[in-house]
Curated annotation (Swiss-Prot):
It comes from the Eukaryota. Amphipathic and cationic peptide with an alpha-helical structure in membrane-mimicking environment. It comes from Scorpio palmatus. This is Antimicrobial peptide Smp24. The keyword Membrane applies.
């Protein structure tokens, strides 16, 4: 009975504190590693999405780099 009371108090503490984010993210990350079939296709999809995002923002980053270099050269 004391174990259940402690568990309820601990879970309530995690719900109301900001420090709980790290614990919840760890638990979710561990669950996704243990049960990948429940949480999606796995790393292939995430690597494709990451590559798509990098390709999407890459031209803008190049333009920004060129613009920053131009402004820095004007300051010198």
């Amino acid at each position: 009975m004391q174990y259940k009371t402690f568990l309820v108090i601990f879970m309530a503490y995690l719900l109301v504190t900001h420090e709980a984010e790290a614990i919840w993210s760890f638990l979710i990350k561990a669950a996704t590693k243990l049960l990948p079939s429940l949480f999606g296709g796995g790393k292939k999809d995430s690597s494709k999405r990451k590559r798509d995002v990098e390709d999407f923002f890459d031209p803008y980053q190049r333009d920004l780099d060129l613009e920053l270099e131009r402004l820095l050269s004007q300051l010198q």
